[in-house]
Amino acid sequence: QVLPPLQGEGDVPVPEPEEGVDELVEYLPRSAVGAACTATAGAYQRKVERLLGLVVDGKQSVADCKAIKAFQTREKIKPANGYAGPVTWARAELLAARKDLDPGRRCPVKKYAVACVDLDRQLMWVRKGKKVTFGVVNIRSGRVGYATRTGWHSVYWRHKDHWSSIYNTPMPYSQFFSGGQAFHAVYGQIATPTGSRGCVNLGYGNARKLWDVLRKGDRVYIWGKRPGS
């Protein structure tokens, strides 16, 4: 079920994001706050170790911390203290996907446009045949109890200045594909410890670009499961 928006299209434009909203700021537990190079293993330790070519043991070593800290410094993730949190993992997954977009060949290649959503890696892209028409970006999908529905869907309603009737919050560049689940922009960090309430969240700039790529009737294919959900 999709409830009508609180505001009509164009009646009240959704707010623009604040400056600096796309900065990469890592989520830290108290034990890692203030450390120059943390000894605490991060929630995404194994994933980050694998992506950075480190020994995958889920334990934080001095070498691990130095390597993760160097990666964070290079990618302008703050604070750069070696903690393997959701922001560091998301950035590492994105860079890996730019080199090898779909290693498992999970997204079907069709003659028509398909929005590919990989819940395992929290990534999405759009392709038409062999051509990628919207490059891979980080996303945030549904949390526990609000799983983003997998399988085939179609974009059936697009509403640029959407306000949620359920949560009374702006959902810029909404493109609905399954009931109340939609691609839409959020204000702030995409890579967070908890997920969305079912929608596929994108950074504001990426959602705006996706708006110009997808059309009503375009297909959406979703697979996998959000880590921790």
Locations of regions flagged by a protein language model:
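N-terminal low-complexity, Pro/Thr-rich disordered segments
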Residues: 1-46, 53, 104-105
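Short acidic, glycine/serine/threonine-rich helix-capping segments at coil-helix boundaries
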Residues: 31-94
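Extracytoplasmic/secreted envelope proteins and their assembly/folding machinery
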Residues: 45, 49, 65-68, 89, ...
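Short, surface-exposed charged micro-motifs
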Residues: 59, 114-116, 174
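Exported/periplasmic cell-wall-interacting domains
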Residues: 78, 99-112, 146-152, 156-229
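A mature extracytoplasmic/lumenal domain signature
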Residues: 84, 88, 96, 121, ...
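A structural motif detector for short, solvent-exposed N-terminal "entry" segments of globular domains
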Residues: 102-145
